[in-house]
Structure formats: C-alpha cells, structure tokens
Amino acid sequence: MIHHIPNVLTKQQVAEFRALMDTAQWVNGKVTAGTLSASVKHNQQLSEQDPLTHHLSDLVIQAIWNNPAFQTAALPHHIIPPLFNRYDEHESFGFHVDNSIRLIRGTSQQMRTDLSCTLFLSEPEEYDGGDLVIEDTYGYHEVKLPAGDLVLYPSTSLHEVSSITRGSRFASFFWVQSLVRDDTKRHLLFNLDETVRSLRIQHGDGYPEVVKLTNIYHNLIRMWSEV
C-alpha cells in the first residue's frame, strides 16, 4: 500500500534544509546504487560521510519518530539513516527495485528493506518532470508531493524518478524494516488502527468496542511482529 504522510517537516524546516543543501558538495548518486540499478541512476547525492548528511539525517529521524501517521503506517523496527539527493535537468533514475538487504551506516548491522520512503524537499512548482512513479498490481502511480510531505511504499515495488525537464528536485530517501514484514498484514493493521481512532473520537476511550478492537489490534501485533 502507498501512504502519503503530510507535514513530516514544516515549511520552515524545509527552508532550513534547503539553505544548508544549497552550499553542500554533491557526489555522483551511483555510489549507493546496486550493480543493476547503477546503469539507470543519473542523479547526485550528499556523501554518506558528510557531516551535513548526519545532521540532516538526525533531524529527519526525529521528525518521523514523532509522527503518529508514519508510526501507524510503517510500524518501524529499524530505519536506515536517511540520505539526500537532487535531480537537475535531464537527470533521472530508471525503473529499478531497491536492494532487499542494506547495511546500517556506521555499523555491521544489516536490515531488511520492507518499506521505501521519499521525503520531498522541493515544491512541485519548482520543477517539471521528476515524478516518483511506483508500479504495483493496480498499475502505475505518479507521486509529486508538497515539500515536507513523505510517501511510503513497499520496497518490493518497481519504481523510477522520471527525467527532470526544468528546475531541480531535492529529497531525502531511506528504508524501513517494519515490525510486520507482510504488506497485506500491515495494511489490515493500519485500517484497524484508523477505525479505532475514529471510534475514540466519536465515543471516547471507554467505549466497549474501542477497548475490544484495541485488544484485537495488539494481539495481532503480538502474533505478526518480529522483534
């Protein structure tokens, strides 16, 4: 399932990110690409060793851990420290699939990539082209969100960033290992949690069905989670 998570960063935070990124040194994006995807990857990114990458990454991690919508949709267990990229005119990243296993930066720990995340740092009117195109069983989905918004989608999906024809597109990207690896089960849990939230608003926390459904939710987490 594809999730749009709005307002992960405020407009002020985005402006601060962009001011720092405008003075940064960018490297060829192929440095983090797998053998197959390197042939279709044409962009730039901040070096993983750049102190600015670490600083901005920490701010993104803080924002997503404090975002209830992200927590509900992703059920995160491990998060790869976010990276940052830019696409200028004529740059693109053709259809590819993300690596299934990634090394967590600065450690010897490996993690499974269940969910891929793009946090947009450019407004849609700043560039033409540059859509994130995600393929699933229902077809192709073109995603271009306001700056500060995030899209979350299964890492099993083929996806691309279409060629930029005007301007520049800045974003943060990272991966999540979920407590629940199966996308269908995560989707069911998400819908159940949203139902509980709606009932709490309508009837209050003490409503018997709220208590019963909350019990079911947590028991399903116990049944399906991997920790």
From Swiss-Prot:
- Domain Fe2OG dioxygenase as annotated: residue spans: 78-178
Please state the Enzyme Commission number of this protein. 1.14.11.-
Metal-binding found in the keyword field: yes
Q: What is this protein called?
A: PKHD-type hydroxylase ACIAD0531
Name the needed cofactors: Fe(2+); L-ascorbate
Which NCBIfam families does the record associate with it?
Answer: PRK05467.1-3, PRK05467.1-4
- Keywords in alphabetical order: Dioxygenase, Iron, Metal-binding, Oxidoreductase, Vitamin C
